[in-house]
């Protein structure tokens, strides 16, 4: 493949999203090594280049056709999308799928001594945020006027530093808010990581590679969400046992050697098999119950 036909994928340079993105690509069979001194990593076994950039640069790189794919948080993507709509600037991309990592929420938070009833409690106050567009959209929908304080980092210290009355920031556990004398009041946006693709014209070979990678991503996520279940069951309670298997579709039932009263059941379950379910299976006569992770799935 020529340089122009190499697939360019933008991922976050550092942080949790970077680690999870790299692990996902490696699980899809893309072999590469990261040199912390370099912003580009070349795959060893596929015509793929990984560009390691700041997360808020990824949507623009995809929308402008500089890269072909990007792995990004939906919050950052939505922030850029609103910005471009405001500026009447094109955003040529499609979201291929949501991923199973990068969960977070964008929330309003105020000092612990603040009496908060609803979002209208912030009328006319100053709110610090790194996501001015998402905040503005939410407040406009609520019909609330406010003053914003744009910060690129350390938003949670703004009230204590006298820069703002409240904040709008990403929350995971809430521990950072608590450490800074704040409490979460309202979630304005929930986010996961996602894969986006530029809609600018792709060569047939590059699009085929994108489709191939996406198929593998789908398989990896399906495998992570599934478990392989094996057990022995008496034929007289077979239907009841199959009905108990969570999310299982068409389990395989096999005869056991020298035992006409019992069968082996193999099933792929898309839900967790909890201890109480296993105890119910045992009560119905099931034995040798094994629940195993699945590394890869396809088809």
From Swiss-Prot:
Signal peptide: none annotated. Pathway: Amino-acid biosynthesis; L-histidine biosynthesis; L-histidine from 5-phospho-alpha-D-ribose 1-diphosphate: step 1/9. Its EC number is 2.4.2.17. InterPro entries: ATP-PRT_HisG_long (IPR020621), ATP_PRibTrfase_cat (IPR013820), ATP_PRibTrfase_CS (IPR018198), ATP_PRibTrfase_HisG (IPR001348), HisG_C (IPR013115), N-reg_PII-like_a/b (IPR011322), N-reg_PII/ATP_PRibTrfase_C (IPR015867). GO terms for biological process: L-histidine biosynthetic process. Feedback inhibited by histidine. Keywords: Amino-acid biosynthesis, ATP-binding, Cytoplasm, Glycosyltransferase, Histidine biosynthesis, Magnesium, Metal-binding, Nucleotide-binding, Transferase. It catalyses: 1-(5-phospho-beta-D-ribosyl)-ATP + diphosphate = 5-phospho-alpha-D-ribose 1-diphosphate + ATP. Its cofactor is Mg(2+). Its main location: cytoplasm. GO terms for cellular component: cytoplasm. Pfam families: HisG (PF01634), HisG_C (PF08029). It comes from the Bacteria. It is found in: Cytoplasm. One of its GO terms (molecular function) is ATP binding. It is an enzyme of class 2 (transferase). Belongs to the ATP phosphoribosyltransferase family. Long subfamily. Catalyzes the condensation of ATP and 5-phosphoribose 1-diphosphate to form N'-(5'-phosphoribosyl)-ATP (PR-ATP). Has a crucial role in the pathway because the rate of histidine biosynthesis seems to be controlled primarily by regulation of HisG enzymatic activity. This is ATP phosphoribosyltransferase. The gene is hisG.
């Amino acid at each position: 493949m020529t340089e122009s036909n190499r697939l360019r994928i933008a991922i976050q340079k550092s942080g949790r999203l970077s680690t999870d993105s790299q692990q996902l690509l490696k699980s899809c069979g893309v072999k590469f090594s990261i040199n912390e001194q370099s912003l580009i990593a070349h795959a060893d076994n596929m015509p793929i280049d990984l560009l390691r950039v700041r997360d808020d640069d990824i949507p623009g790189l995809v929308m402008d056709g500089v890269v072909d794919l990007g792995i990004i948080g939906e919050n950052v993507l939505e922030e850029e999308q609103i910005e471009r709509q405001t500026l009447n600037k094109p955003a040529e991309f499609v979201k291929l799928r949501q991923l199973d990592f990068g969960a977070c929420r964008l929330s309003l938070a105020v000092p612990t001594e603040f009496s908060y009833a609803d979002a209208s409690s912030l009328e006319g106050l100053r709110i610090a945020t790194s996501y001015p567009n998402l905040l503005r959209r939410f407040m406009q929908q609520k019909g609330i006027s406010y003053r914003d304080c744009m910060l690129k980092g350390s938003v949670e210290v703004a009230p204590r530093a006298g820069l703002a009355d409240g904040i709008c920031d990403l929350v995971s556990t809430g521990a950072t808010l608590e450490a800074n004398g704040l409490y979460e009041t309202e979630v304005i946006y929930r986010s996961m990581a996602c894969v986006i693709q530029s809609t600018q014209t792709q060569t047939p070979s590059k699009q085929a590679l994108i489709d191939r990678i996406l198929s593998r991503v789908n398989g990896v996520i399906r495998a992570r969400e599934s478990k392989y279940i094996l057990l022995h069951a008496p034929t007289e309670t077979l239907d009841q046992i199959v009905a108990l298997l969570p999310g299982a579709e068409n389990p395989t039932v096999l005869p056991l050697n020298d035992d006409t009263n019992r069968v082996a059941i193999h099933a792929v379950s898309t839900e967790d098999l909890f201890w109480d379910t296993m105890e119910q299976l045992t009560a119905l006569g099931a034995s040798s119950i094994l629940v195993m992770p699945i590394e890869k799935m396809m088809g």
